[in-house]
Amino acid sequence: MIFGIGCDVCALDHLEKSLSGPHAAAFVRRVYGPAECTALALDTPLPAGHSGAHRLASAAADFAATEAFLKAAGTGLREPFALREIEAVRLESGAPAYRFSGATARWVADHGLTAHLSLSHDGGMALAFCILETAPET
C-alpha cells in the first residue's frame, strides 16, 4: 500500500552557489551523508580544467531525493529527520536507492516502509521521485 509520494526539483545553478560559496563545507556536512560525500567527492576540489557538470547534476539529484523523501513521509524537515541521514546511493546496477541512518532509519523501520527512488537531470534541473510503500496487510 502506498504510504506517501514525494517529488522535488533542484536547479543546478542554485546548488552550485551553495557548493562553492563561503559556507560550502558547512552546507555539505549538514545536507549530505557520508556515502554521498564519498561518491560525489564533495570534499575534494575539482581538478583544473574539469567542469564538474556530472558531479553537480548528481549532487542536485541527491539533494532533490532527500526533499522528495521528506514530502513522501508527510512531515517535512522536523524530528526525527536529519538531512544527512537520508542518502541517495547507487546500487551495483547503477539504479538509485535510499540509505537511511540514525533516527530516520528507525522511523522508516517503525513504519514498516520500503522506499523507492527515481532520479533524472537535464536542462539545468535535477528531479527526484520517491514512493514510500508499506507491506500489504494480510
Predicted features, each with a name:
Residues 1-138:
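Core catalytic alpha/beta fold that binds nucleotide/phospho-ligands
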